[in-house]
Swiss-Prot record:
Binding of Ca(2+) 6, residues: D642, D694, D696, D702
Comp. bias intervals (Basic and acidic residues): 175-185, 228-238
The family this protein is said to belong to: Belongs to the MCTP family.
Biased amino acid composition, Low complexity: 1-19, 65-79, 131-141, 149-169
Positions contributing to Ca(2+) 3 binding: D486, D492, D539, D541
Organism: Homo sapiens
Gene Ontology terms: biological process: calcium-mediated signaling; negative regulation of cell migration; negative regulation of endocytosis; negative regulation of response to oxidative stress; regulation of neuronal synaptic plasticity; regulation of neurotransmitter secretion
Sites where the protein binds Ca(2+) 4: D486, D539, D541, D547
UniProt-annotated binding residues for Ca(2+) 5: D642, D648, D694, D696
Protein name per Swiss-Prot or TrEMBL: Multiple C2 and transmembrane domain-containing protein 1
Residues annotated to bind Ca(2+) 2: D277, D330, D332, D338
Protein origin, superkingdom: Eukaryota
Highest classification ranks of the organism: Eukaryota, Metazoa, Chordata, Craniata, Vertebrata
One Pfam family cited in the UniProt record for this chain: C2
């Protein structure tokens, strides 16, 4: 048991809290050194510490032996609590905007006895946290302390404009605790700080401790001369002074949370500027810079050392970390302008939504002693996102610092600061905040090492991605009619996205008002309600600050989950639109659907789906072609992407522009997802793409494998093992994924949908110049052309009678065809060719050969891609020869299109896709009958009338060619190779796995 203090006469505190008391005592002493010249109230109380007063020695360690039982010993032992009592009151009350700093109580002879009342740490903490409204506090108020209202007698009344004198040196202002310490030294004991800035205990300053970096090492104690230096008074602008207002203030301190702020600056005038011309005058003008980029330039006032500008500038800033840099120059015609001085304005010291008059002293870093005059400004800082902040994100930010860098009281202080900020944001009274603080101190985790362990675990949990409530996938498609920001009537636009602390930036599209981005970004949702995504469009300017084009927002709570939404957003404060695709996908905590809950397993739902796509409902919603259900079961033998030999795999399922994700299975090479995805089929010729990625918190996800499955090749209800392929789908990679897919569709709707343009996929891999790809496309085109060349050689050989029997047969056939030719014979010949190849296939005489040439070319291309990736990492500056590259890429793509066209015609007659070949047979039969029954002149007449009147009947109809649309559904030889299924390893067979389990 711990010895009792004689003067206190209280029950003994528990032994478990003794170590915490000792640490709290030590931290209170450290807080004294950090809070010199702090808070309001009267200075020089009987026990008040100044820079001249040394800190008392720490109390002796608590043990099991006897301790001195004198009243003086007890009083000195717990004097730290009494001296910091109202400091604690000020700290916790500072979270309420209508509370003021209370003055310290005078110590009375009986004060030690009152401080020692209570038997536990909880009792003592309650006494220090609850504001005293009677007794000593009232007495101190009556004796000349802080009067009602919270202001000391010498404090000036606060004004609405908060006029302040801010003089700056060219060096950036200090940040964090060091800035507060320096401000305390300059202001001295008589200065009065705003209550939001009180920082008596390390780690308990409500907002700075939450949002600022860790404090630097403690500076050496200052001499009495140094501590008295600020009291002698300062010349105007001789040193940097932090903005402070006396008394109570309802203005909010700007948060360091990343966000959009509007800075309205009125450049009023200059006084006593430096003369730079021979006549003893100057032609001054002012530049504003943020982040090294110019954001404003004033007009030139000729021959004046006291210029009056009265110019206004509106600046949008992303964050408040960068100060505003003000530079003054003297304009010289034909020569370099002369420098007249500069100053910094720290944006973090400005109060929100409150006009502030600022006086800046100009300095030259090369000649710091020269008097260069002053600049007068009026500044208003306004948050663009409003006053409400995401409390969840602020709490997450408070745990970013490692527990190795935080002492115990800093963890407690930051935790208190977050909760204080929460109650302040909600506008609740002070009592619930104090109640929370008491409850937290009673928590057993506040004891010894257990608290640090718990804080470390909580920090890790907040950083873990399995706390996501979902994933927001945003596809930035294009911009339309954006505002021209450059002198040439164009812009170089890019877009920024922000959701909480997550930010993304798109690529820059040079010199266009209708950019095509086609980029995709993923955000993590930490709230059930979703949140709001802030979107801003900017114009890139070299050497200057980027111009603001416009902004818009997406409220995720208004969007339904598991669906892809196409949004056309009007830019506010600007011109133009942004076109986005937004998909909300649930995470593991709110699953898409488990294997036990899916549509096709329920017999009633299955019958309803079959009825919806029955042949009787042909003309009901022609765009709804079918229903697709994908069961993502598991994967085995995935590639290890982390240094630990494991991966954090998740699966992405894509059908055209619909994109859904599974949850992440951590530290596993054989993950089991057991999720069911459902899609509405708009085109039966679409390809289902299933990609496995490794999640990486610090950078983009790593590719593990991919498989592409045409919907028409799917066998319903069969669990199948698909070997994962590389990014180009040209060769296998490590791992197998098990899928079970069901497709239900209406054949008539699918056939009609085949004859209209296919849906464009917005996210496609950007083409790049590749020597091997260019060679491959040239060879493909050459093979198609050689078919026609060989046919011409064959006909010419018949004319030359190289083989008399063959030439004679060709001559007789020519006479017969020309004599009896009718137009319907053209589709009839094609029909006979299709029928002939079909009978060859079903009879087992398949003349289709595996295209090994194309496969070899794809393998060579894959090797070259790997080399290009390595070269691109070494040569990040490859921006040369862009014009030649664009031309070569265009030629490369044209060769690809021509070669693909010829290959699609060949594959149509080869029955590569039986559905399309049967559709071609039906179409050719109909076309043959029409040509047989109707004269050609009437067919041509109907065709011409249709073409001439199409725009009159449907002004916005898309001009298309049905034959080309049909051929676009037929895969080329490259796609045939990509869609081929690889034979899995027999060890991965699900049936063998079950047999082994049974055995």
């Amino acid at each position: 048991m711990e010895p009792r203090a004689a003067a206190a006469g209280e029950p003994e505190p528990p032994a478990a809290s003794s170590s915490f008391q000792a640490r709290l005592w030590k931290n209170l002493q450290l807080g004294v050194g950090r809070s010199k010249g702090g808070g309001g109230g009267r200075a020089g109380g009987p026990e008040r510490r100044t820079a001249d007063t040394p800190s008392p020695s720490p109390p002796p360690p608590v043990g099991t032996g006897n301790a001195p039982a004198r009243g003086s010993g007890a009083g000195s032992r717990w004097s730290g609590f009494k001296k910091r009592k109202q400091v604690l009151d000020r700290v916790f009350s500072s979270s309420q905007p209508n509370l003021c700093c209370s003055s310290p109580e005078p110590l009375e002879p009986g004060g030690a006895g009152r401080a020692e009342q209570g038997s536990t740490l909880r009792r003592r903490i309650r006494e220090h946290l609850l504001p005293a409204v009677k007794g000593p506090a009232a007495a101190s108020g009556a004796a000349g302390g802080t009067p009602p209202g919270g202001r000391s007698p010498d404090s000036a009344p606060s004004s609405s404009s908060a006029s302040s004198s801010l003089s700056s040196s060219p060096q950036p202002p200090p940040r964090g605790d060091r800035a507060r310490d320096e401000g305390a030294r300059r202001q001295g004991p008589g200065a009065h700080l705003c209550h939001q800035k009180s920082s008596s205990l390390p780690g308990t300053a409500c907002l700075e401790q939450l949002l600022e970096p860790p404090p630097p090492p403690a500076e050496p104690a200052r001499s009495p001369a140094e501590s008295r230096a600020p009291e002698t008074g300062e010349e105007h602008g001789s040193s940097q002074k932090i903005i402070n207002t006396a008394g109570t203030s309802n203005a909010e301190v700007p948060l360091a949370d990343p966000g959009m702020y509007q800075l309205d600056i009125t450049l009023r005038r200059g006084q006593s500027l430096a003369a730079r011309d021979r006549g003893g005058t100057s032609d001054p003008y002012v530049k504003f810079k943020i982040g090294g980029k110019e954001v404003f330039r004033s007009k030139i006032i000729h021959k004046n050392l006291n210029p009056v500008w009265e110019e206004k500038a509106c600046i949008l800033v992303d964050h408040l970390r960068e100060p505003l840099y003000i530079k003054v120059f003297d304009y010289d015609f034909g020569l370099q302008d002369d420098f007249m001085g500069s100053a910094f304005l720290d944006l973090t010291q400005l109060e929100l939504n409150r006009p502030t008059d600022v006086t800046l002293t100009l300095k030259d870093p090369h000649y710091p002693d020269h008097d260069l005059g002053i600049i007068l400004l009026s500044v208003i800082l306004t948050p663009k996102e409003g006053e409400s902040r995401d409390v969840t994100m602020l709490m997450r930010k408070s745990w970013k610092r490692s527990s190795k860098e935080l002492s115990e009281n800093e963890v407690v202080g930051s935790y208190f600061s977050v909760k204080s900020l929460f109650w302040r944001t909600c506008g609740r009274p002070a009592l619930p905040v104090l109640g929370f603080c008491r409850a937290e101190l009673q928590n057993p985790y506040c004891k010894n090492v257990q608290f640090q362990t718990q804080s470390l675990r909580l920090s890790d949990l907040h950083r873990k991605s399995h706390l996501w409530r979902g994933i927001v996938s945003i596809t930035l498609i294009e911009g339309r009619d954006l505002k021209a920001m450059d002198s040439n009537g164009l812009s170089d636009p890019y877009v920024k996205f922000r959701l909480g602390h997550q930010k993304y930036k798109s690529k820059i599209m040079p010199k266009t008002l209708n950019p095509q981005w086609r980029e995709q970004f993923d955000f993590h949702l930490y709230e059930e309600r979703g949140g709001v995504i802030d979107i801003t469009a900017w114009d890139k300017d070299a050497g200057k600050r980027d111009d603001f084009i416009g902004r818009c927002q997406v409220d995720l709570s208004a969007l339904s989950r598991e669906q892809t939404h196409k949004l056309e957003l009007q830019l506010e404060e600007g011109e133009g639109h942004l076109v986005l695709l937004v998909t909300l996908t649930a995470s593991a905590t709110v699953s898409i659907s488990d294997l036990s809950v899916n549509s096709l397993e329920d017999q009633k739902e299955r019958e309803e789906i079959l009825k919806r796509y029955s042949p009787l409902r042909i003309f009901h919603n022609l765009k709804d072609v079918g229903f697709l259900q994908v069961k993502v079961i598991r994967a085995e033998g995935l590639m290890a992407a982390d240094v630990t030999g494991k991966s954090d795999p998740f699966c992405v399922v894509e059908l055209n522009n619909d994109r859904l994700l599974t949850h992440t299975v951590y530290k596993n090479l054989n993950p089991e997802w057991n999720k069911v995805f459902t899609f509405n089929i708009k085109d039966i010729h679409s390809v289902l793409e299933v990609t496995v990625y490794d999640e990486d918190r610090d950078r983009s996800a790593d590719f593990l494998g991919k498989v592409a499955i045409p919907l028409l090749s799917i066998q319903n209800g069969e669990q199948k093992a698909y070997v994962l392929k590389n990014k180009q789908l040209t060769g296998p990679t490590k791992g197998v994924i098990y899928l079970e897919i069901d497709v239900i569709f209406n054949a008539v709707k699918a056939s009609l949908r085949t004859l209209i343009p296919k849906e464009q996929k917005y996210i496609e891999e950007e083409n790049r110049l590749s020597k091997q790809l260019l060679l491959r496309n040239f060879i493909r085109m050459k093979r198609c052309v050689m078919v026609l060349v060989n046919a011409a050689y064959y006909v010419n050989s018949c004319f030359d009678w190289d083989s008399p029997p063959r030439s004679l047969a060709a001559f007789v056939l020519f006479l017969f065809v020309v004599w009896n030719f009718e137009l319907y014979m053209i589709p009839l010949v094609l029909l006979l060719l299709l029928t002939w190849n079909y009978f060859l296939i079903i009879s087992g005489k398949d003349n289709r050969q595996r295209d090994t040439v194309v496969e070899d070319m794809l393998e060579d291309e894959e090797e070259e891609d790997d080399k290009d990736d390595k070269d691109s990492e070494k040569k990040g500056f490859i921006n040369k020869i862009y014009a030649i590259q664009e031309v070569c890429v265009s030629v490369q793509n044209i060769l690809d299109e021509v070669a693909s066209f010829g290959e699609r015609i060949k594959n149509t007659f080869n029955w590569t896709v039986p559905f399309l070949s049967w559709l071609a047979i039906v179409a050719l039969c109909v076309f043959t009958a029409i040509l047989y029954c109707i004269p050609l002149r009437y067919i041509v007449l109907v065709w011409g009338i249709n073409k001439f009147t199409k725009k009159l009947r449907s002004p916005y109809a898309i001009d298309n060619n049905e034959l080309l649309d049909f051929l676009s559904r037929v895969p080329s030889d490259v796609q045939v190779v990509q869609y081929q299924e690889l034979k899995p390893d027999p060890s991965h067979s699900p049936y063998k796995r079950k047999k082994n389990n049974l055995g």
